[in-house]
């Protein structure tokens, strides 16, 4: 026997697209963007993709990832370390794009906090594109939020990517806190962004700019 009334479900397992437009949603989105760094730091894939092939790190006698150290034909896009990092970083980048685009219309947060969240998003986006540039060269440089599946992909250039990374970090630095607050520990700080900017300049062969940023950082800490 069927029910007499229409069942209206209160779905709590999914977050609507408008949630990020709220004060709590913007803060939660920023936390979600940070979580995408888990694919790189303190993980096997981060080690495999960064220092395999050097004297610092090598494979053992056993294990299924030895080919990443010897660059065999098994080292391709089907590799879990590559696909997981790629997917997680682009999810993080898209979240950052949403934060940057939507923050201005969010109510219930002070302008200072909104500026800080945008600065954090720009740092994370710059960080991810820097790692992707090191690993893959030119990639799809997405700077706006993607809200629907798309097959429209365009490969950018390393020069354009470095220019955007430098722009993001330069814009983020003034709005980041000088040091972490004990009550809100773990957020990116101004010195962290300055350190990354100095490193990016170094990789982009802008040695004078790198020295200037890093010397200022050293003298201020």
Please describe what each predicted stretch is.
Residues 23, 27-31, 35-39, 63-136, ...:
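Conserved, well-structured interaction surfaces
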Residues 3-50:
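Membrane-proximal, proline-rich intrinsically disordered regions
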Residues 122, 194-201:
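TPR/Sel1-like alpha-solenoid repeat signature
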Residues 214-219:
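TPR/TPR-like (Sel1-like) alpha-helical repeat modules
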Residues 12-16, 73-76, 143-150:
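Short linear capping/connector segments at secondary-structure termini
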């Amino acid at each position: 026997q069927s029910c007499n009334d229409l069942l209206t479900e209160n779905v709590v397992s999914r977050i609507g697209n408008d949630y990020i437009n709220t004060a709590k949603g913007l803060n939660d989105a920023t936390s979600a963007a940070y979580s995408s760094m888990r694919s790189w730091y303190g993980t096997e894939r981060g080690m495999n993709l960064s220092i395999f092939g050097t004297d610092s790190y090598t494979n053992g006698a056993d294990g299924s990832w030895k080919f990443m150290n010897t660059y065999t034909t098994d080292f391709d896009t089907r590799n879990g370390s590559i696909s997981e990092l790629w997917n997680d970083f682009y999810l993080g980048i898209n979240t950052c794009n949403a934060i940057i685009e939507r923050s201005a219309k969010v109510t219930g947060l002070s302008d200072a906090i909104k500026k800080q969240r945008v600065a954090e998003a720009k740092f994370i986006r710059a960080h991810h594109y820097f790692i992707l540039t090191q690993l893959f060269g030119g990639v799809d440089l997405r700077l706006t939020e993607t809200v629907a599946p798309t097959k429209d992909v365009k490969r950018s250039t390393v020069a354009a990517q470095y220019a955007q990374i430098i722009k993001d970090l330069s814009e983020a630095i003034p709005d980041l806190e000088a040091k972490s607050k004990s009550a809100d520990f773990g957020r990116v700080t101004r010195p962290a962004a300055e350190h990354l900017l100095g490193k990016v300049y170094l990789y982009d062969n802008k040695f004078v700019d790198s020295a200037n940023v890093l010397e200022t950082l050293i003298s201020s800490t």
